[in-house]
Amino acid sequence: MPKLEQFEIKKYWQIFSGLKPIENKVNHDQVLPILYNSKLDSSVLNKIWFLADIDDDDNLDFEEFVICMRLIFDMVNKNISSVPDELPDWLIPGSKVNLIKERKKRKQIENADLPPKKEIKVDWYMSPDDLNQYEKIYNSCAKLTDGTITFNELSTKLSTKFFNISKTDLNKVWSLINPQNLPSIDRDPTFYFIHCLRQRNDLGAEIPASLPNSLAEVCNKKQLSYDLRSSQPPTKRKEEANEVDNLRDNGQNSSSDSSGSNVLSNEDSIKQKYASLTDDQVANMREQLEGLLNYKKSEKTQGGSKLSKRINIRSITDDLDNIEQQVEVLENYLNNKRHELQALQAEIN
């Protein structure tokens, strides 16, 4: 690693001055654009910052800034393959020699007092404060039209918040909470993605090889498909509807009674299916169903398109009726839950 040259120091001074230091120091937020533009892994940047911040005040004076910049450039230009555990003597400013010695002594004492490291496991429970924090991150992310978020969007956002996680950590947790290898994930898996990485960053928790069964069900659930050309097999509801249509075509008026009983049976099954959902899950599902309903309606009105010619109008009508029914059931369920909540709040007060 070549030693510092005078022209380098002048270049670093120009950069340092451009960051508008306060009391001859710059903080992490001021240096963050430089760190981010280096494209180095966040764990590497975190180690560089630790080495450069010799007095541990979370700010860099010019001498410390020079150390930070030199290590970054050496990593980017591949002059070194990894960040050293300790600063080389030629990179330590004369005014900081005593501070370096004190830091080494503190580290030795701390290591001597530390008990053997135990493996920290991820705790999947999320407190209300955790949920509020993850909700803010989720809302700040750019989403696709179906409300899901891509890996690139999430990893870019979290790399600016968690400095102790690597790209490998991001990829491992993404594979963990996205077992179907989907291009994007919805709200619940996103929360677990953030929650796991946060514990990895803050506590050094080990990334598990698999999810608990209850979480695996959440992360394995299929997203609602909006593709009318999908090759999914016909549902039982559609088969029953076709049987009713055949009876009607043959002049058997009793089909209306059969259809009515099917609707009641279908409504009961929908209520049972959604009875265990939370208010947030109900609201999210309602939003998806309404989106699909609007999409189907627009497709039905565009009868002149090539796609609509290939679609059975009767099956579209069945889909519209079924979706409207599910939306109505969900609305009733959500209203009942709200009334229950109001009643509980009234009892507490």
Swiss-Prot record:
Residues 276-334 are annotated as: 2 X 20 AA approximate repeats. It is a peripheral membrane protein. It is found in: Cell membrane; Endosome membrane; Cytoplasm, Cytoskeleton, Actin patch. Sequence repeats lie at residues 276-295, 315-334. Changing S258N: In strain: YJM 280, YJM 320, YJM 326, YJM 627, YJM 789 and YJM 1129. The modification Phosphoserine is found at S276. Residues 307-349 form a coiled coil. InterPro entries: EF-hand-dom_pair, EF_Hand_1_Ca_BS, EF_hand_dom, EH_dom, End3. One of its GO terms (biological process) is endocytosis. One of its GO terms (cellular component) is cell periphery. Residues 249-265 have a biased composition (Low complexity). Its main location: membrane. Residues 236-248 have a biased composition (Basic and acidic residues). Ca(2+) binds at D53, D55, D57, N59, E64. GO terms for molecular function: actin binding; calcium ion binding; protein-macromolecule adaptor activity. Keywords: Actin-binding, Calcium, Cell membrane, Coiled coil, Cytoplasm, Cytoskeleton, Endocytosis, Endosome, Membrane, Metal-binding, Phosphoprotein, Repeat. Component of the PAN1 actin cytoskeleton-regulatory complex required for the internalization of endosomes during actin-coupled endocytosis. The complex links the site of endocytosis to the cell membrane-associated actin cytoskeleton. Mediates uptake of external molecules and vacuolar degradation of plasma membrane proteins. Plays a role in the proper organization of the cell membrane-associated actin cytoskeleton and promotes its destabilization. Belongs to the END3 family. Present with 2610 molecules/cell in log phase SD medium. This is Actin cytoskeleton-regulatory complex protein END3.
